């Protein structure tokens, strides 16, 4: 990431800041997604779904590490990510005190969103065509993995809770 230009997305400060802001949410977000699935993992009896959960946890951990490294590069340019990430950490503390069903519903919503975003990126490679090569590699890799495990949180939710009321409510919020 150290080689990535400051305005790495279409040479645009706005688009670069937008993508960097999105990236800065991933380490805490990915950790929360893992937490929400682990909350109920012991209730899942299906071996295939357990294997998918294990893969999901591994992929989310890799995403968190990759985006932590990507985000660290922006401190060189005096991006103030620490204040934003402190705000995210306070929100994370709040949602981790919600009922596990609500936490998993939140994860379902975000995983759905990131899979849609990942699908868009892969169907429209021109969107990322103006990024530095290292940035393209990060975002395309992350997009592929989001699509690969897009249904895991949903499948866990259905397996454990079997209803849509809370999940749909959270999805609309």
Language-model-detected regions and their locations in the chain:
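Non-heme di-metal
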Residues: 1-173
């Amino acid at each position: 990431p150290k080689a990535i230009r400051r305005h790495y997305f279409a040479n645009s400060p706005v688009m670069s800041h937008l993508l960097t802001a999105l990236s800065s949410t991933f380490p805490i977000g990915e950790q929360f997604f893992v937490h929400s699935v682990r909350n109920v993992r012991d209730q899942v009896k299906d071996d295939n779904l357990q294997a998918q959960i294990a893969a999901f946890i591994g992929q989310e951990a890799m995403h968190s590490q990759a985006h932590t490294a990507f985000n660290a590069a922006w401190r060189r340019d005096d991006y103030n990510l620490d204040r934003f990430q402190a705000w995210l950490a306070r929100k994370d503390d709040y949602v981790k005190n919600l009922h596990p069903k609500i936490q998993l519903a939140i994860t379902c919503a975000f995983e759905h969103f990131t899979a849609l975003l990942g699908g868009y990126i892969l169907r429209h490679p021109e969107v990322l065509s103006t990024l530095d090569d290292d940035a393209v590699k990060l975002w395309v890799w992350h997009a592929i993995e989001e699509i690969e495990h897009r249904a895991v949180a949903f499948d866990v939710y259905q397996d454990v809770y079997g209803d849509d009321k809370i999940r749909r409510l959270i999805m609309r919020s």
